[in-house]
Structure formats: C-alpha cells, structure tokens
C-alpha cells in the first residue's frame, strides 16, 4: 500500500522531526510512505475573508499537483467525520480491498483547505473539534496510521 501525506508548511522543530522520523521508520514495514511538504503562503495579520480564500486557493493548487488520479484522498478537516481508531483502520483496509492501494492524506495550513481540495477528497476526516497546529497534526496522523496497521495486523499496541 502507498500512503502519501501532503502537508502545507515545513517542520522546523527538532522534536517533531524526530517523531515523524520514528513513525516513518515504524510504518516502513506496512506501507510505502511519502511525505510531501508544499510551501505555506504568508497570511497577513487581519486578513480579509477574500485574502484568506486566495491564500487557501494558492496552497490548494500546490496540494492538487501532488495528488495522483488513482489516489483515495482523505482530507483532514474540522468539519469532517470523527471516528475511532478501529474505524480508521477499517477505512484503510476498505481502501485496500476495493483496489485503492494509494491513499493521500491532506493536511492544510493554518487557514485550512481550499474548496478545490475538499471537492477532490473522497473522505473528510476530523480528529477532534479542537484546533491543532498543522505541524503537530502530522505527527498525530502518522501515529494513527501506524496504529491502524497494527490493528489490521492484529499486533499489540498500547491503548
């Protein structure tokens, strides 16, 4: 299975890079992982809604360039569906069983995802109604993908 994580912005903090590297290493036994970073657009203080939408559209265009036609796209979205870890593992397994061996997870920048990206998504997923920094969220997503594979392989993992 091929999994891409397409994310807006670069990870600068060493502790987050270390966690990403650790989960990437752990996931290598279950899937081919590709992490793609697209540049984030600078958001001016007190940006208007129109300015925010333009920024999201620019970031969205960059994101869409990295999504393959055959990808099952899961957009991380505050308005998405919240599911348990077991349901998340079922979602990944259902992709595999229905011939979608390529999954692209998309993490937006500080303003979220553009309508173009949300329209391309096959599934909208929310981890919580809370807002998280998108850099930290990448680590959280990797952990849940790792947990999902452990569940699917019936391997022990802390609860």
From Swiss-Prot:
Task: Please write the reaction equations for the catalytic activity of this protein.
Answer: pseudouridine(1915) in 23S rRNA + S-adenosyl-L-methionine = N(3)-methylpseudouridine(1915) in 23S rRNA + S-adenosyl-L-homocysteine + H(+)
Which residues does the record give as S-adenosyl-L-methionine binding sites?
A: 76, 108, 127-132
Q: Does Methyltransferase show up as a keyword for this record?
A: yes
Q: Which domain of life is it from?
A: Bacteria
Recorded GO cellular component terms are:
cytoplasm
One Pfam match: SPOUT_MTase
Keyword rRNA processing (UniProt): yes
What are the protein's GO molecular function terms? rRNA (pseudouridine-N3-)-methyltransferase activity
Q: Describe the protein's quaternary organization and the partners it interacts with.
A: Homodimer.
Described function: Specifically methylates the pseudouridine at position 1915 (m3Psi1915) in 23S rRNA.
Protein name, UniProt field: Ribosomal RNA large subunit methyltransferase H
* Cellular compartment(s): Cytoplasm
E.C. number(s) listed in UniProt: 2.1.1.177
Which cysteines are cross-linked by disulfides?
A: none
What UniProt keywords apply to this chain's record, in alphabetical order?
Cytoplasm, Methyltransferase, rRNA processing, S-adenosyl-L-methionine, Transferase
Q: Which family does it belong to?
A: Belongs to the RNA methyltransferase RlmH family.
